[in-house]
Amino acid sequence: MVSNPMDTMTYLSLKSTGLNPKKVIGMGGALDSSRFKTYLSLALNKPQKGLDAMVIGGHGDTTMIPMHRFAKYNDEPISKLLSNDKISEVVKSTMVGGATLTKLLGTSAWYAPGSSIAYLVDSILNDKKKIIPCSVLLDGEYNHSVPCIIGKNGVDEIIELDLNELELVEFNKSVDAVRSMNSTLSSHT
């Protein structure tokens, strides 16, 4: 799923079609993670190739959670490479990146979402088993971006992160916001 509000559209598509939940995937986490990597790369003044970073949560500037605690460059935690202030700046830039681009373009982005979808499709078609944050059904009642192993069957596995207390609070706030949107739009379908 690409259309916004992406998490809710993925959820509604799943509920209205009755398709296997492992095959209904939203690309928001992949897109948001690519933006996070871009901003980290710029802050580090290093190529993206060595970066391992992801965004979980909803695909929205108030619901996404850039997971800076897990981010690494060539296996070195970014917390050892960037100051806390710089990391906070990268996180903020990531969270407003889509809105900033839309404002500059006067329309929604198309290249980065297309690239994110191509990345997902490549992992599915070639059974690459890549770990990609995707919006998938969780607990049978909402969709949210979490790291998933993506292969020929769609979502092969959902990877559970060991979130600290603050990250868990942020994730639960994000879940509540997506649930609210699901409820609002579900009542109109």
Regions found by a protein language model. Name each.
Residues 1-37:
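Rossmann-like NAD(P)(H) cofactor-binding subdomain of soluble oxidoreductases
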Residues 41-189:
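Long, compositionally biased stretches enriched for glycine and/or charged residues
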